[in-house]
Amino acid sequence: MIALIQRVTQASVRVDGATVGAIGRGTLALVAIERGDGATQVSRMAERLLGYRMFPDSENRMNLSLAETGGGLLLVSQFTLAADTAKGMRPSFTPAADPETGRRLFDALVDATQRRHSPVATGRFGADMQVFLVNDGPVTFLLRCPPDRPPGG
C-alpha cells in the first residue's frame, strides 16, 4: 500500500462538480492499493496516517501527528501511484490491485481511520475526481507498507 501524504491548510475533492469530501487543516492522502495487500497493510497504513509526525510543535519542529493536532484526514484513492514506471514512456499498472480488491481494502482503510480519528473525509472510489488542496510548507511524504507478497508474485 502506498500513500502520498501532504500537510494541508485545506483540501477537497469533487465528483461531477459536487464536493464529496473536504477538510480544513490536516492531511490529504492519495492512496494506492497494491497486489498482495491485505489486512496487515490496512492496519499499518492507518497507524502511520494518524501517527506520522509532520506537524510543527511549539518550537516549529515536525513533532506532532495528525491525531495529536486533531486535524482532518482526506483519503483519496489513486491507483496510478502503484504504477511501474521503470521502463519506456508508458506506465504499467500491473502492480496495482484489481478494482474489487482495491475498493474493499480502501474501504477498510477508511473504516480503520474513522474508528480512531475524526474528521475523516473521502473521495469516491473509481470516480473521475478533481482534488483541490493548499499544501502547507510544502510538506509531502511517500509512505509505503509493502505487500505480503511481491506484486505479480
From Swiss-Prot:
Protein name: D-aminoacyl-tRNA deacylase
SUPFAM superfamilies listed in its UniProt record: DTD-like
Free-text function comment from the UniProt entry: An aminoacyl-tRNA editing enzyme that deacylates mischarged D-aminoacyl-tRNAs. Also deacylates mischarged glycyl-tRNA(Ala), protecting cells against glycine mischarging by AlaRS. Acts via tRNA-based rather than protein-based catalysis; rejects L-amino acids rather than detecting D-amino acids in the active site. By recycling D-aminoacyl-tRNA to D-amino acids and free tRNA molecules, this enzyme counteracts the toxicity associated with the formation of D-aminoacyl-tRNA entities in vivo and helps enforce protein L-homochirality.
Keyword field contains RNA-binding: yes
Domain notes: A Gly-cisPro motif from one monomer fits into the active site of the other monomer to allow specific chiral rejection of L-amino acids.
UniProt-listed Gene3D superfamilies: D-tyrosyl-tRNA(Tyr) deacylase
Organism: Methylococcus capsulatus (strain ATCC 33009 / NCIMB 11132 / Bath)
Subcellular location: Cytoplasm
Entry's family note: Belongs to the DTD family.
Keyword presence, Acetylation: no
Principal cellular location given in the protein's record: cytoplasm
Motif (Gly-cisPro motif, important for rejection of L-amino acids): 137-138
Enzyme class: hydrolase
GO biological process, one term: D-amino acid catabolic process
